[in-house]
């Protein structure tokens, strides 16, 4: 049974923004992920626990965006006008802590670790899109930094169910506890 200490646990939501949602191909839809993440966020807020909303973003000229040559570039050719915005169902509030990242992981080049440590956080509940990219990069970094991790499996999605399931079944069990949103809500 999962037990979480409300005083030392934070929710970190990865890339739930309008420009990323279309890339949720499975096994959970973007709407399912956002609604479940919204339930988690509401519970954390009601308990006075911190909610971190992490977004990826660059300047208009993409000066600081990654540009290395790769075999499988991002499928995004043009970003929609509202690509930065959090979906309404996430219920973002002024009490949420915004983190802007420019890499896949939420720790590199941001003050996320500082924000967590100064609040006495030792456990992170992690969710978002994509399971195997932004969420996994953040999870790996968090584990390397000594944080306890809980992955909200049904509040994550990837480009395909296969990509999602690879992270859920093979990577996360080595660095985290993988649970449903319902199990996490019951543990808070």
From Swiss-Prot:
Coiled coil: none annotated. One of its GO terms (molecular function) is hydrolase activity. It is an enzyme of class 3 (hydrolase). Keywords: Hydrolase. Its EC number is 3.-.-.-. Gene3D superfamilies: Isochorismatase-like. It holds the Pfam family Isochorismatase. GO terms for cellular component: cytosol. Belongs to the isochorismatase family. This is Isochorismatase family protein YecD. It comes from Escherichia coli (strain K12).
């Amino acid at each position: 049974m999962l037990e979480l200490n409300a005083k030392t646990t934070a929710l970190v939501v990865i890339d739930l923004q309008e420009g990323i949602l279309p890339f949720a191909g499975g096994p959970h839809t973007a709407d399912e992920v956002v609604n479940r993440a919204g339930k988690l966020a509401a519970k954390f807020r009601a308990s006075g626990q911190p909610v971190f909303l992490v977004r990826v973003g660059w300047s208009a000229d993409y000066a600081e965006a990654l540009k290395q040559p790769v075999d499988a570039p991002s499928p995004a050719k043009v970003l929609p006008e509202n690509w930065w915005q959090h979906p309404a169902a996430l219920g973002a509030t002024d009490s949420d802590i915004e983190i802007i990242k420019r890499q896949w992981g939420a720790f590199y080049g941001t003050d996320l670790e500082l924000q967590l440590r100064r609040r006495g956080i030792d456990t992170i509940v992690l969710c978002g899109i994509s399971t195997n990219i932004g969420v996994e990069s953040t999870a790996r970094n968090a584990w390397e930094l000594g944080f306890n991790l809980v992955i909200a499996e049904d509040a994550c999605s990837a480009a395909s169910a296969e990509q999602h399931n690879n992270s859920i079944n093979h990577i996360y069990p080595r660095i985290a506890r993988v649970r449903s949103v319902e199990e996490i809500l019951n543990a808070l």
